[in-house]
Amino acid sequence: MHLATGLAVALPFIGAASAQYFPPPVEGVTVVESKFDKNVKITYKENDICETTEGVRSFTGHVHLPPNNNDFGVNQNYSINTFFWFFEAREDPKNAPLSIWLNGGPGSSSMIGLFQENGPCMVNNDSNSTTNNPYSWNNKVNMLYIDQPNQVGFSYDVPTNVTVNPINDEVTVADFSNGVPEQNNTLLVGTLGSQNPYATANNTQNAARSIWHFAQVWFQEFPEYKPNNDKVSIWTESYGGRYGPAFTSYFQEQNEKIKNHTITEEGEMHILHLDTVGIINGCVDLMEQATSYPDFAYNNTYGIKAYNQSQYDSMINEFYRTGGCRDQLIHCRDVAAESDPHFYSHNETVNKICNDAGDFCGQKLEDAFESANLGFYDIAHPLNDPFPPQFYKGYLSQAHVLADMGMPVNFSQASDAVWKAFHTVGDYGRGDVRGYIDDLAYLLENGIKVALVYGDRDYICNWFGGEKVSLALNYTGTENFHKAGYTDVKVNSQVGGQVRQYGNFSFTRVYEAGHEVPAYQPEVSLEIFHRIMFNKDIATGEIDIAQKPDYSTTGTADTFHIKNDIPPEPEPTCYVLSMGRTCSEEQVKAVKDGTAVVENYIVKSPAGKKQGPPPTSTSPPSPTSSSEGSVKEFSVSVLGVSVLAAITFFL
């Protein structure tokens, strides 16, 4: 798919209360120097923002790694300063397991998950205060949110002054030696990472190598985490469909090397006791999931039809025809296996072949969805989708919040540098060393739970493709998993979805949920999370899977027959820190010419207008064509950004 090249940088918007240019001075930060390497350190600060439950502690900070700290074969000539936000469990943190949370992208901040989905608080519409989240995932689990790879979110290489155009999210490295320009509606200033795409991991496998080094430091030397339960899980979302399998399998491989003394370096011999990899609406494998895009857009359980029959047939043909998407992906993976088997992305020929394959598949099978004017993350919502609210971006630009967190840089929701790095080497079309689907099989064979959870209104990483991935796994339990039927997921008095489960492996369809499932169905999502983390069956939460490892659901062979109603359209909310995703042409123009009335980052005038119900006929507008190698543009020139820039990456 063509991912976005724009940023949604949460720098103060002109006229906002407590607006400022740069982060306030860093104060009250604890510095821990590594006992293994004097050049490695942790800086952190305890705070009581977001998690306000009495007695529950939270910490924000960075793990600082010097240049050339990564594995042999990876050119890492830059510093890595990886941001984390750790929340103790609200209940019995000493005996609670820990889960890492990672958003996708590539280049998206895990603050998306924290503030929009499953963290201890939700930001109010003033973008300056929060409300406690009773469905927070740290109710019973210690949660570690990480911004990765380098330059994502609050992570950085070198603090660098920048300007930001909030109309199109363009970030430009700036020289303020002659003074700092005054902010206005089309110019913001602040401090981020260098914006250098060569100063970050350039593919999923290299990101796994980098995050393993982070984990070695954090789990051994972060002084505020000393649990009795040392189980570690990874939960992730979207492009995390690649991160989850790659990172967890890499961690497991490193564990094996530590055990057999292949790894003997002091400070890098901490075994991570892996428990679960959970993937929410993950884009795991393009080969397996590519046809799910036209399939879902044409025939879904909501009766929404983005394409007519001829458009659908054309897209399917682009996958199967000679020289089409499938053939190009096969060629990409064949040459990668031969010429870049360890996935370092040093081979420019492999990089170009895989880049071209990913771009072709995106253009031919996905991009035309724009023409239906439907939400990429929620097919039942309009393209300018106000849900989940974006208020956290303004919150993370407030001076008092940055001061409480001890941040030396401003916040950016997505890193253009990271996206460029991954895109250039063709990460989207490739698999990692083993292949992401085979990674999941490897984890299951090693006793690690694998949970696939998909909201059924998401287009961009839809449940059709997720189900295909689940059925493509080849492991010792494959036959029994295929025989397992779908059954209801019961949460209190409601049915939240359906699940197919055999032992440690499950695929769950969550009803009435878009891409960020916990934002839509917080109670159901929390219960699914708890059942998986604490070894209970997903359907009822009453059966101990650890005691009954051959547990299997019974029911129908598929779940497509269960249909859904289209929900009411949400009220439009144009948020100036997410203009490309939430604002109309008229509103963007008003912001640009200075006539918009803005309050707490929300455009009050001109008011937004509802789009109307999504198409349910077979004759939506025809997709506009695009030239080879380009991304289609909105016909509205005032926006000046591609449709995929507007949707801002895989979240």
Swiss-Prot record:
Biased composition range(s): Pro residues: 612-623
Residues annotated as the enzyme's active site: 238, 458, 515
Propeptide residues, chain positions: 626-651
Keyword Calcium recorded: no
Signal peptide: 1-19
A Gene Ontology term for the protein's cellular component: fungal-type vacuole
Catalytic activity annotation: Preferential release of a C-terminal arginine or lysine residue
UniProt name for this protein: Carboxypeptidase S1 homolog A
